[in-house]
Amino acid sequence: MWAIGGVQLNSRLLLGTAQYPSPQLMSDAVKAAGVEIITVSLRRQLSPQKENYFWDLLRSLPCHLLPNTAGCSSVKEAVNTARAARELFNTHWIKLEIIGDEYTLQPNPFELVNAATILVKEGFEVFPYCTEDLILCQRLVDAGCRVLMPWAAPIGSGRGLMNTYALQVLRERFPKNILIIDAGLGRPSHAAQVMEMGFDAVLLNSAVALAMDPVVMAAGFAKAVEGGRLGYEGGMIKARNVAKATTPLIGKPFLIEKP
């Protein structure tokens, strides 16, 4: 059991709702993984031309909605989108995304901090999508963010942890903040590695939605997240450069050479 934004949760896996072959597969994947928080894009997925089936399906799931500002590239766009999301979904949670480069989808750190400062003052619980840069994360915490969502690698790349050292530093420097890896994971083993490092949760989208079988993959990631967390809580042994026997010598016969 853990808590985020005043909400008690069991699952440490969050799922995005985009790119699935069908809304029903998305729903099945969410249920298979036992997910309790799902993200949704107001700008990319909400359209007056679309049928209400998708939104009805989202609301039917036993999950908390975390709207995001995907597609925004400025403070003004992100803040306006966040305000609209609060009205539409009746939540003060917002996953803050402000992209600074369309090729790498790397967040714009300057706009991100400015937008976070505004939204925190307006009462939002801000979940900022950021890089693993220590100074950026410190500025976000100083702005009032209690949650940080650093990437492991660029969105949708599936590359896994590109900078393990920097991520470990974040965990050590922000022990009281909730840290959720937000992008770049491609395999369940990546998720297990993140959780073994002490991160609080993992957010996935492409790795599940674009898998050959999203439902099976969602279940696999859920088990990996759980296993990694248990490994962290259990206290893993430290790696050694030499072998250490595990079998005691008590009761084991041995020869004594006569002088």
From Swiss-Prot:
Keywords: Cytoplasm, Schiff base, Thiamine biosynthesis, Transferase. Belongs to the ThiG family. GO terms for molecular function: thiazole synthase activity. It is found in: Cytoplasm. InterPro entries: Aldolase_TIM (IPR013785), Thiazole_synthase_ThiG (IPR033983), ThiG (IPR008867). Pfam families: ThiG. It comes from Coxiella burnetii (strain RSA 493 / Nine Mile phase I). 1-deoxy-D-xylulose 5-phosphate binds at G156, A183, G184, N205, S206. HAMAP family: ThiG. The keyword Cytoplasm applies. PANTHER family: THIAZOLE SYNTHASE (PTHR34266:SF2). Pathway: Cofactor biosynthesis; thiamine diphosphate biosynthesis. GO terms for cellular component: 2-iminoacetate synthase complex; cytoplasm. This is Thiazole synthase. It is an enzyme of class 2 (transferase).
